[in-house]
């Protein structure tokens, strides 16, 4: 390494900032699966060039060149998501990576594995034909307007505590459960009535509401739950943690709303009907007889896991409801039947990624953004009081589902392997474009 070289801090920072806005789009190869502390590929490309180049040439001048350092071997003994490995290979170098975490080893092998796009598409189409119909049947409801069966995108749930007096209290912090991410510009919101449990439309910040179904007057901003406590109808305050069942069972959960899409592609919220409850109960019965996906491993003690264990989440199976277990089991069965090991492992990696968005620790981010806030949105494992149940297979307008993650993550990552690009910012217009500047 030539010590007289200068690292192009400002140029790389500008590119890195753009990359960070949509990392899964701008460097899809490293985002087929969740990993913590992921590094930016543009930064690592520049760092590797700085370390490898012996000349005094400005590193930035060679950033967009196609390189062939086949006489160089890069070692990363703590490779994590594989950014160092991937960027080294793009520069034509040899790369060796390892990690103490087996997830890392599996993940990096899958993201760098070259597979036929045609074979990948064929396997996905087979899953869509043979597996998705059974899953999609589990996510449907009766349209309030047409009376027809229509797809459900998301179900809304709330945890319920039982006081020593036997009163059941839903853990709503407020009764506004859905609003736009830019609420000041689009103030329309969805409200659940605490009396009749019907859904109606209101405004995100309104403090006085009258339920059009039962006439109940209430403040949608004031739910019974506040931070670590809950208030009974008689005004008594309890610590939520003190109301966790002593027999080791989980808190009760109630399904209270859903978001469906009609045949015209229009989304609308609905209250829960008898049909929805019966459908869920039917699936619960089927789970008793068949579920390949049953992660019964114990949740081991730890700083974060103890937060879940404190609410009686003792096995990883507890993180999913029965419909999720049933549908994920169907999907896993289909994936395990894929004959090609290489293709099968690609879909197993995608299946694992799908779990992040399909469990009862997810929540609703709202409209105007990706709807599902996944389990690892924060580095904690505290149970979600108002969990969101996603549709496992999903639809074109879904967020965080198997079918959408296949198209937006796995497929994009494989296409990137064939055409690895770098972001380029025009110095005059500041417009961003893509440049092929790497070995395939």
Predicted regions and their residues:
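Conserved SAM/SAH-binding loop
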Residues: 81
């Amino acid at each position: 390494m030539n010590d007289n070289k200068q690292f192009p801090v400002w140029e790389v920072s500008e590119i890195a900032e753009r990359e960070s806005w949509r990392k899964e789009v701008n460097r899809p190869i490293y985002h087929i699966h969740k990993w913590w502390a992921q590094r930016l590929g543009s930064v690592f490309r520049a760092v590797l060039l700085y370390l490898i180049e012996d000349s005094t040439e400005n590193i930035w001048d060679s950033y967009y060149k196609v390189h062939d350092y086949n006489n160089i071997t890069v070692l990363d003994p703590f490779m994590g998501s594989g950014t160092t490995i991937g960027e080294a290979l793009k520069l034509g170098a040899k790369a060796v990576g390892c990690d103490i975490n087996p997830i890392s080893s599996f993940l990096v092998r899958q993201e760098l594995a070259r597979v036929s796009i045609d074979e990948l598409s064929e396997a996905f189409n087979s899953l869509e034909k043979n597996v998705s119909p059974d899953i999609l049947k589990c996510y449907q409801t009766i349209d309030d307007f047409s009376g027809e069966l229509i797809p459900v995108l998301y179900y809304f749930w709330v945890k319920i505590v039982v006081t020593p007096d036997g009163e059941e209290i839903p853990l709503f912090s407020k009764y506004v459960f859905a609003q736009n991410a830019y609420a000041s510009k689009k103030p329309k919101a969805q409200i659940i009535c605490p009396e009749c449990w019907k859904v109606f439309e209101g405004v995100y910040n309104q403090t006085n509401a009258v339920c059009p179904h039962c006439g109940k007057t209430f403040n949608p901003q004031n739910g019974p739950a506040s931070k670590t406590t809950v208030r009974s109808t008689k005004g008594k305050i309890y610590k939520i943690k003190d109301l966790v069942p002593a027999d080791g069972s989980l808190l009760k959960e109630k399904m209270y709303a859903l978001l469906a899409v009609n045949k015209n592609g229009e989304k609308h919220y609905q209250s829960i009907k008898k049909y929805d409850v019966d459908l869920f109960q039917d699936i619960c019965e089927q789970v008793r007889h068949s579920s390949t996906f049953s992660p019964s491993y114990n949740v081991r003690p730890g700083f974060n896991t103890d937060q879940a264990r404190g609410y009686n989440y003792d096995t990883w199976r507890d993180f999913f409801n029965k419909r999720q277990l049933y549908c994920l089991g169907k999907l896993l069965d289909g994936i395990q039947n894929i004959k090609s090991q290489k293709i099968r492992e690609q879909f197993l990696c995608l299946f694992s990624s799908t779990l992040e968005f399909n469990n009862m620790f997810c929540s609703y981010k709202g409209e105007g953004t990706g709807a599902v806030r996944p389990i690892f949105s924060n580095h904690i494992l505290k149970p979600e009081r108002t969990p969101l149940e996603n549709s496992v297979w999903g639809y074109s307008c879904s967020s965080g589902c198997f079918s959408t993650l296949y198209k937006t993550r796995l497929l994009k990552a494989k296409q990137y392997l064939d055409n690895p690009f770098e972001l380029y910012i025009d110095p005059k217009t500041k417009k961003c474009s893509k440049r092929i500047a790497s070995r395939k």
